[in-house]
Curated annotation (Swiss-Prot):
Keyword Transport set for record: yes
Keyword terms of this UniProt record: Electron transport, Membrane, Mitochondrion, Mitochondrion inner membrane, Respiratory chain, Transmembrane, Transmembrane helix, Transport
Protein name: Cytochrome b-c1 complex subunit 10
Taxonomic source organism: Mus musculus
Membrane-spanning intervals of the chain: 17-38
An individual GO BP term: cellular respiration
Subcellular localization(s) per the UniProt record: Mitochondrion inner membrane
Mitochondrial matrix topological segments: 1-16
């Protein structure tokens, strides 16, 4: 579908930039977790969620 709009040059550029964009996305996600309340985000991870039970 995307190849109908992009020529071969731009398809090759997009293919080369996919790993870089993925790495920056990962760095951004880790930075977001670091900058915000990490426990709030990690409560959604099932394995880690069980480790931090709230004592009521």
């Amino acid at each position: 579908m995307l190849s109908r709009f992009l020529g071969p040059r731009y398809r090759e550029l997009a293919r080369n930039w996919i790993p870089t964009a993925g790495m920056w996305g990962t760095v951004g996600a880790v930075g977001l977790v670091w900058a915000t309340d990490w426990r709030l985000i990690l409560d959604w991870v099932p394995y880690i969620n069980g480790k931090f039970k709230k004592d009521d």
